[in-house]
Amino acid sequence: MARETSINKYRNLGIMAHIDAGKTTTTERILFYTGVSHKLGEVHEGAATMDWMEQEQERGITITSAATTCFWQGMAGQFDKHRINIIDTPGHVDFTIEVERSLRVLDGACLVLCSVGGVQPQTETVWRQANKYKVPRIAYVNKMDRTGANFLRVVKQMHDRLKANAVPLQLPVGAEDTFKGVVDLIKMKEIIWDEETNGLKFEYGDIPEEMRAQAEEYREKLVEAAAESSEELMDKYLESGTLSEEEIIAGLRQRTIANEIIPVLCGSSFKNKGVQAMLDKVIELLPSPVDVPAIQGVNPNTNETEKRESTDDAPFSALAFKIATDPFVGTLTFVRCYSGVLEAGTTVLNSVKDKKERIGRIVQMHSNSRVEIKEVHAGDIAACIGLKEVVTGETLCDVNAPIILERMEFPEPVIAVAVEPKTKADQEKMGLALAKLAQEDPSFRVHTDEETGQTIISGMGELHLEIIVDRMKREFKVEANVGAPQVAYRETIRESVEQEGKFVRQSGGRGQFGHVWLRIEPQEPGFGYEFVNQIVGGVVPKEYIPAVDKGVQEQMQNGVLAGYPVVDIKVTLYDGSYHEVDSSEMAFKLAAAEGFKLGARKAKPVLLEPMMKVEVSTPEEYMGDVIGDLNSRRGLIQGMDDELTGKVIHAQVPLANMFGYATSLRSLTQGRANYSMEFDCYNEAPNNVVEEVIKSKSK
């Protein structure tokens, strides 16, 4: 089946924003104007089409990036039919992983900003991620009808805070409750949208006299920005002082795709003004799949780098960027097809796992309603039903042309809590539910703590884990109690000792006799456990030696200070004795355990606590508060770097003092800082911590 839309008329578009910038309403309007959605869903009524999970409707924040396909021919029908695949991305800091996933598969993005709040904390985070993936973008300043709306202030903030080369393509006509339209600086006309038809109709008019001087000033900046795209245009501009509309668009397009400028538009999505013109600019200025560099990957057989061009003739390759569980069809695997054609019913290779998978049905999504399709072409986004083993970030490709497209990197979880089902009957259901949720979301992990036996879930923040527990209840009908997080302490020793260990039971009948001498010594941190046998002359028969090793290792699981595992020690068995009849493996195991326990008590035992490597990115004005807070958490500041939007602080902080950090950092910096945390090493805990830990263990 031939493709319906040629690939140069595709736009894979991400809508990025901070919470409350009006992103979901903007997406709704796009669906309305492109003819997909006939009733406008408002977020504050909890009915938006893109927000398809119940918790999102309650909280009014977008959690899952839903992928939607729509078509656009221009506000005045001036274009050929273009296909726009929209990926809606969440704006909450705990969901940055979702944003990373969607940015990875986009060709271009539209950043939605609030005309009152301007560049907000999460905007900076999302901006950094878009820079990382070099995503060309335009900006849309929304909510121009709100009290305090100020378009040019937001443009200045983009320059100052995001270091963006922002180029306004429009100016607002009026603001707050008098906002009625925009001045198009390319056409030098006013655009007024018709309220009767919810903005489906519009008229061009002359620029209001009082705005003419300002419009001419900004038009000149715009033409200059376009002229800088090539020497040819610059020469023409210098000679004639202006450029044609076509030349301006061509120059702006080239520089937008090269990430040299950010064209800025404005409007009020809620009042049905501005989204239509923004869609026109998505078509005119943002890249199609063939305008961005061909994706590169590694051939797993040769380890050579290979390219995949965005054509239907190339071997099939696609990236799985999201897994979702649908109550009716099971697992949906969202894929971005980079090259070739994928047909329903064919077998493909998961090159990361080197496993073949059969593609069952393929669907395209409009929010959460589905249209079944027979094949997916290069440049398209769709969801496959029935893939068993694929997880987010893996590559699907032609069986005869294996390639691993760039692997997505997922941040380590930063917060962990223990969960237990409210009833015994829910135990198995909880395990299945958590496994499904972990498959959908690589930033969420589940493991069983061997020491406490608890199920520990970890994720990107408190809200992230709240929503996981919430989804277990709603989707899998499992109620869980959530405990306080546990820290995995360890113990070791600081001195060498020699210790006798004896186990004797000799009161009638067959007795038990085991007798050992152990030398117990500390090792370098991270060296682990070492057992040395120095028995000579058979004073301990060799068949009992493994039992001695086993007895020591079992006792090491239960340290003498607070019952935590003992690490980094060397144990040497150098002497002992045995009884011809009464000795046994069990007796020597128990003798060794006793000897180790007594010896460890004399060898200056210490408690070790996990230390985390913490990096905080913060605007400079909050740096003092952030450092003060890290110091109060027994943190050791190890250095600082400059970055575009502020400072990066490097510190080492005990894990026990990092709980609740996401929340307190958010309130310290009004949410403008973000942080990453990973395990660094174990360090000796100070006395006050040791006392607290021993006290809490003995309760």
UniProtKB/Swiss-Prot annotation:
GO molecular function: GTP binding; GTPase activity; guanosine tetraphosphate binding; translation elongation factor activity
Transmembrane segments: none
Lineage of producing organism: Bacteria, Pseudomonadati, Pseudomonadota, Gammaproteobacteria, Cardiobacteriales
Record function comment: Catalyzes the GTP-dependent ribosomal translocation step during translation elongation. During this step, the ribosome changes from the pre-translocational (PRE) to the post-translocational (POST) state as the newly formed A-site-bound peptidyl-tRNA and P-site-bound deacylated tRNA move to the P and E sites, respectively. Catalyzes the coordinated movement of the two tRNA molecules, the mRNA and conformational changes in the ribosome.
NCBIfam families: EF-G, PRK12740.1-5, small_GTP
Signal sequence, renumbered to the chain: none
Binding site for GTP: 17-24, 88-92, 142-145
Protein name: Elongation factor G
Entry-linked Pfam families: EFG_C, EFG_III, EFG_IV, GTP_EFTU, GTP_EFTU_D2
This protein's GO CC annotations: cytoplasm
Principal place of residence: cytoplasm
